[in-house]
Amino acid sequence: MRPPHVPEVALHLADEAHDLWHRTEEELSEIGLPPPFWAFAWAGGQGLARYVLDHPKTVAGKRVLDFASGSGLVAIAAMKAGAANLTGADIDPFCETAIRLNAEANAVEVGFLGADQVGRDDGWDVVLAGDVCYEKPFADRLVPWFEALRSRGADVLVGDPGRSYLPKDRLQKLATYEVPVTRALEDAEVKRTTVWRFA
């Protein structure tokens, strides 16, 4: 499948979002596993991937971390835009396979880190994060880390479809997109998604 806002990228995604999401979420919760966030191209990731493809200088020739990578959509877009080195990071172990398969489908290489990266600094030039401010405790952990990365010179970009815990007072708006989404997942057919830079 090709996400509607980023048709340049081919992904292995769930095509029946509603049934898969609800059935899998219930079944996996019984055995203590997380929902399959990696099986969908979320609006924040689509907006961020679109921005990177439209503004390749953001990543061209740079070492990039795609944080909370999920399917690898943003990572793949960054590689297509000319990133020198790309690492996708996600704590869901299923993401490693999803990212590998999706990278292969797009003829790019994406490394993978499965450990929690919050607080870590491997000297990335750019950190990309799509749709990560959906819960307050998680956003509260991310903001100091993103600010520390920014203060030492990294470019930190976040794609966000209007989640409640985005710290807009610390951000610079770069672009806004109307991203087609699945109503079963987002309760809408289009999500206004903004790409922000930590200032």
Residue ranges and their predicted role:
Residues 1-199:
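S-adenosylmethionine-dependent methyltransferases
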